[in-house]
């Protein structure tokens, strides 16, 4: 399995996890000229912009650490575009890390 396929499977798993917790998935792989958001969900009245990091077996680095300042900037840019075109709402940024050890959901990650 290549990196793209691994990432896609991670996003599918993360979306299923969020749905089981009562969230509604509004968009997947939302792209703009300067950024992409893996998942956009709604939890009550809050929009949740989710970055999914899938770590293949044997990788020990943290998915959260991979969401560096540059990556956060791209996600924020894409979120601004989404809010501009879909209307303002309360929002937060989450990171979901998927690894051989399981799934870890970090709310308000940045």
Model-found features: residue ranges?
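Residues forming the ATP-binding cleft of Hanks-type serine/threonine protein kinase domains
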Residues: 30, 53, 109-110
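Conserved catalytic cores of phosphodiester-cleaving nucleases, focusing on short active-site segments
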Residues: 18, 37-61, 75
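Short, low-complexity, polybasic intrinsically disordered segments
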Residues: 100-110
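Acidic-basic catalytic patches of nuclease active cores, encompassing PD-(D/E)XK
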Residues: 1-28
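Protein kinase-like catalytic core scaffold
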Residues: 46-48, 92-94, 104
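Catalytic cores of nucleic-acid endonucleases
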Residues: 54-101
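Active-site metal-binding core of divalent-cation-utilizing nuclease and nuclease-like domains
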Residues: 24-47, 101
């Amino acid at each position: 399995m290549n990196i793209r396929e691994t990432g896609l499977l991670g996003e599918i798993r993360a979306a299923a996890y969020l749905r089981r917790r009562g969230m509604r998935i509004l968009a997947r792989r939302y792209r703009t000229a300067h950024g992409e958001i893996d998942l956009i969900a709604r939890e009550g009245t809050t929009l949740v912009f989710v970055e999914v990091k899938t770590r293949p077996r044997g990788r020990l680095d943290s998915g959260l650490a991979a969401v560096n300042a540059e990556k956060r900037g791209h996600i924020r840019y894409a979120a601004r575009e989404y809010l501009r075109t879909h209307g303002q709402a309360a929002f937060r940024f989450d990171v979901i890390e998927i690894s051989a050890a399981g799934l870890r959901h970090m709310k308000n990650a940045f």
